[in-house]
């Protein structure tokens, strides 16, 4: 509202529930003329943390009763009360009780004088996190004075200081004087002095954050620069001068050496100069070698990309035959280790070269670096933060190599199986014709790569996973000695997996021993993890053989073929028997006697019982 001109103006505030004045009471206000102040609107989002009682409590100690002309009024009503409907709901606004009842709001187009209080401006720091983007200014907090709150929010003020509108915290620093009174100007000046000092502190703190550059520590292995010819002469003569004059200072010794150098003949000087030149040449050579060594060390520290392939044993190209009852071979993906495992991009060029060479040829070994955080907690290694996976040109049923798809993200949703170091012996043509065969390119896994082990024993690890095989850490079952000179009759191995999914890293593998002449075994093997050294890198060397994903079980039929005998002379199939087999149609020319047939069958049965005890059911036909 506008007040008419005059020196004595009275503002009557009416309202049945006003906490300060009744309708008959008035208070005196000085005239400010007809000046009008434009108060800019302020848009605030709803903030449930701003309650009316909190804001009122903030101003409990801000009233100055001593500066008021009406002592009784200031003593009784000195507390500034603020109604803050900052976009709040009606229910929250009613928490203020009588402060909001009766429609008691002021439209303050004129500033009420500072006769009742000489306090500096009251500021409210509003966090900018929930504000609209329009209020995001130069600083994290916005300062709002009472006049803005009173005009925008309809505040009831009990004699508090009213300031001219402030558009921003920076505008408050301008030199324009306030039109109210000298007391008000003093308060604003004090407020002005405080703000630049605060800004200066912030700037100084920002400058102090810059850490001084640290000097590089000199490498003790770095070759030292050669000294000059004069320095060589100084070294030679200093000891002699010190011996003659023990009390001579360094400056005196230097003067004596300088005079001796000047009086030295040119030929003697050339001797020292030649020594210096030779030392420079040696220094340059040593420096070049030192730099090369530093670069090599930096390359080794990042990733060692030169794998050491284990010893390889030649084996015939195996052929896996799938039982017709099982579904068609599905795509086989690496095991789901994490929601997304992206292989290091440094292998992309290497992958491109492998893709051009195709599936044929000698497979190369690729290292895939997978961080420890990407692996589930059940298979994290206790020795380090990195797990190095070395698949040897993995061939899946899609006909793709894992090395070629290493730049793609491994999908975690599909459960898949990696069978490592499993060599399925060649199947006979007659038996293979009755079963569904996989295409030849997908049936060529790399040659058997064996771990460095005694030739008489091969470790087999079987992991249990819902659809396929997976490693379970069970106590090793009874050792079964099988001496295969030729392949036994076809075995059908049916794996009935457990309902629970477990992957463990400390492997206690069941052991199947074969004869020294036949170190190869025909049992599928999974996830052989080796820890060659106590370093922080573990290596998993995996050879993936295509397999069939079946909802309940997986049938792998091993059909006897024509294996490559490692010994020049065929021997009996039974483990431990060194006799040559006799010709017999019933035994397929594999046994030397009926006793060996019975013992071999007993060993196979015991192996089946042991595997059943370790939660792997193997049916032997």
From Swiss-Prot:
Return the Basic residues bias intervals: 208-218
Per UniProt, activity regulation is: In liver, recruited to target gene promoters following treatment with dexamethasone and cAMP. Binding is decreased in presence of insulin.
Task of the protein: Transcription factor that modulates cell fate reprogramming from the somatic state to the pluripotent and neuronal fate. In liver, controls the expression of hormone-regulated gluconeogenic genes such as G6PC1 and PCK1. This regulation is independent of the insulin receptor activation. Also acts as a regulatory component of protein phosphatase 1 (PP1) complexes. Component of the PNUTS-PP1 protein phosphatase complex, a PP1 complex that regulates RNA polymerase II transcription pause-release.
Name residues in a coiled coil: none
Q: What is this protein called?
A: TOX high mobility group box family member 4
| PANTHER family in the cross-refs | AGAP000281-PA, TOX HIGH MOBILITY GROUP BOX FAMILY MEMBER 4
Q: DNA-binding region(s): which residue ranges?
A: 223-291
- Subunit field text: Component of the PNUTS-PP1 phosphatase complex, composed of PPP1R10/PNUTS, TOX4, WDR82 and PPP1CA or PPP1CB or PPP1CC. Interacts with PPP1R10/PNUTS. Interacts with FOXO1 and CREB1 (increased by cAMP); FOXO1 and CREB1 are required for full induction of TOX4-dependent activity and the interactions are inhibited by insulin.
């Amino acid at each position: 509202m506008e007040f008419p001109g005059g020196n004595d103006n009275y503002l009557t505030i009416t309202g049945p529930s006003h906490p300060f004045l009744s309708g008959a009471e008035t208070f005196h206000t000085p005239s400010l003329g007809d000046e009008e102040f434009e108060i800019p609107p302020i848009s605030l989002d709803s903030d449930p943390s701003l309650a009316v009682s909190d804001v009122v409590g903030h101003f409990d100690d801000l009233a100055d009763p001593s500066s008021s002309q009406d002592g009784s009024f200031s003593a009784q009503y000195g507390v500034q009360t603020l109604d803050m409907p900052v976009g709040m709901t009606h229910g929250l606004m009613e928490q203020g009780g009588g402060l909001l009842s009766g429609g008691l709001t002021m439209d303050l187009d004129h500033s009420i004088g500072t006769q009742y209080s000489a306090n500096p401006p009251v500021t409210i720091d509003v966090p900018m996190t929930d504000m609209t983007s329009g209020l995001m200014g130069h600083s994290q907090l916005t300062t709002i004075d009472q006049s803005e709150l009173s005009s925008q929010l309809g505040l009831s003020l009990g004699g508090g200081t009213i300031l001219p509108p402030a558009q921003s915290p920076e505008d408050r620093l301008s030199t324009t004087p306030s039109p109210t009174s000298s007391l008000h100007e003093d308060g604003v000046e004090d407020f002005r002095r405080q703000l630049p000092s605060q800004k200066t502190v912030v700037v100084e703190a920002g400058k102090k954050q810059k850490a001084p550059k640290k000097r590089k520590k000199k490498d003790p292995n770095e070759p030292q620069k050669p000294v000059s010819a004069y320095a060589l002469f100084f070294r030679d003569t200093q000891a002699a001068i010190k011996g003659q004059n023990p009390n001579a200072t360094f400056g005196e010794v230097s003067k004596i050496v300088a005079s001796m150098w000047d009086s030295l003949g040119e030929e003697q000087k050339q001797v020292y100069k030649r020594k210096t030149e030779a030392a420079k040449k040696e220094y340059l050579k040593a420096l070049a070698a030192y730099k090369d060594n530093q670069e090599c060390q930096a390359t080794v520290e990042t990733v060692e990309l030169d794998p050491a392939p284990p010893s390889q044993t030649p084996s015939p190209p195996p052929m896996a035959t799938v039982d017709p009852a099982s579904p068609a071979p599905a795509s086989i993906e690496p095991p789901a280790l994490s929601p997304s495992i992206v292989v290091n991009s440094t292998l992309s060029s290497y992958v491109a070269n492998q893709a051009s060479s195709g599936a044929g040829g000698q497979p190369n070994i690729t290292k895939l670096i997978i961080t420890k955080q990407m692996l589930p907690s059940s298979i994290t290694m206790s020795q380090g933060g990195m797990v190095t996976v070395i698949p040897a040109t993995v061939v899946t049923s899609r006909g793709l190599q894992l090395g070629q798809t290493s730049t793609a993200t491994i999908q975690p949703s599909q459960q898949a199986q990696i069978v490592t170091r499993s060599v399925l012996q060649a199947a006979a043509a007659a038996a293979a014709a009755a079963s569904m065969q996989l295409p030849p390119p997908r049936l060529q896994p790399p040659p058997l790569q064996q771990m460095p082990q005694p030739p008489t024993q091969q470790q087999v690890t079987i992991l249990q996973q819902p659809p396929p095989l997976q490693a379970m850490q069970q106590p090793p079952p009874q050792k079964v000695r099988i001496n295969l000179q030729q392949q036994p009759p076809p075995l059908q191995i049916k794996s009935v997996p457990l309902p629970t999914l477990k992957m463990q890293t400390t492997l206690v593998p069941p052991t199947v021993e074969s004869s020294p002449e036949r170190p190869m075994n025909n049992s599928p093997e999974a996830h052989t993890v080796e820890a060659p050294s106590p370093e922080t890198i573990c290596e998993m060397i995996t050879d993936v053989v295509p397999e069939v994903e079946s909802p309940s079980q997986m049938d792998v039929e091993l059909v006897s073929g024509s294996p490559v005998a490692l010994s020049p002379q065929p021997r009996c199939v039974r483990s431990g028997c060194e006799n040559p087999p006799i010709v017999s149609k019933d035994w397929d020319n594999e046994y030397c006697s009926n006793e060996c047939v019975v013992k071999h069958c007993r060993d196979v049965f015991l192996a089946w019982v042991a595997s059943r005890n370790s939660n792997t059911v193997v049916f032997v036909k």
